[in-house]
């Protein structure tokens, strides 16, 4: 997959239908201090020789440890993805909408044991409308999370539901 030039990254992101909060994170500004948990730095790897997956042009968002996060335009909408810099040929579609991406990021923050009131404040700061639904769904499903597989399945289903709801907005 070709990567948008580093000098064109922010203008291209600003041209997409992305929220001010997501754009701020892509610019290195955190809409809430706890969002540092979801971002380890500006895109570095994709501009310094790391391989990238084949497919449509990638617009890098940020790095998250050894993962690169990005968005690409597809005929049927946006696709948010991440890939390991060590295995770029196996990208993971995180979501098809920004709200779905927030669902993924909020799951990671929940796993860091952030206070629920703080998570609600972060949701308000970034405009994540589905946090109450996510929390209810997780509380109902969590007793079945004995192994990581059930959690992964629940998260995939949640993101699909959030993407579907966001597509109707």
PLM-predicted stretches and their roles:
Residues 106, 120-123, 159, 163:
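Residue-level detector of alpha-helical secondary structure
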Residues 16-19, 97, 127:
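Helix N-terminus capping/helix-initiation residues
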Residues 1-76, 81, 133-169:
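A surface-exposed partner-binding patch
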Residues 65-68, 87-90, 128:
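Short, solvent-exposed loop/turn segments at secondary-structure junctions
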Residues 79-120:
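Compact, glycine/acidic-enriched structural inserts
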Residues 111-143:
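An amphipathic alpha-helical core segment
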């Amino acid at each position: 997959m070709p990567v948008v030039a580093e000098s064109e990254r922010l203008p291209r992101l600003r041209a997409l239908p992305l929220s001010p909060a997501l754009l701020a994170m892509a610019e290195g500004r955190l809409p809430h201090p706890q969002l540092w948990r979801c971002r380890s730095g500006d895109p570095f790897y994709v501009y310094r020789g790391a391989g990238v997956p084949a497919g449509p042009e990638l617009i890098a968002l940020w790095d998250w440890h050894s993962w690169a996060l990005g968005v690409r335009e597809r005929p049927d909408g946006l696709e948010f993805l991440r890939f390991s810099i060590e295995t770029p040929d196996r990208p993971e579609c995180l979501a098809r909408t920004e709200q779905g991406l927030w669902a993924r990021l909020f799951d990671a923050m929940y796993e860091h044991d952030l206070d629920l009131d703080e998570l609600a404040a972060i949701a308000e700061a970034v405009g994540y409308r589905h946090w109450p639904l996510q929390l209810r769904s997780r509380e109902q499903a969590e007793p079945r999370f004995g192994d990581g597989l059930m959690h992964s399945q629940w998260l995939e289903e949640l993101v699909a539901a959030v993407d579907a709801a966001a597509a109707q907005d």
